[in-house]
Amino acid sequence: MPSSQSDIELASSTETTARGREVQLIINIAEPDPEFQPFALTDEASLLDAVPTPVSEISRRLDAYFRADLGLDLAIPLWRLVDRIKRLRPGWPDDLEPN
């Protein structure tokens, strides 16, 4: 059965879009090369879904950025990851921006 574009239904991206700045920052840390960054994300996508970077390297980069191991679950949806980081680091992302 041939499929058409009308058969494709993407999941919502409302929560991810609402946290766009923070989501993009996390993606930039996890995978600095724009060629390997996603062009679209849904609310169901985790950081592990979004970039091809190995988990150990993502963790290392996030630990270096935050200057601590926050014990983050990289398999949860990105928007939930952002909310988790904000609970652990209430001033983020502004408190870690370069001067």
Which residue ranges define each predicted feature?
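Phosphopantetheine-dependent thiolation modules in NRPS/PKS and related acyl-activating systems
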Residues: 1-99
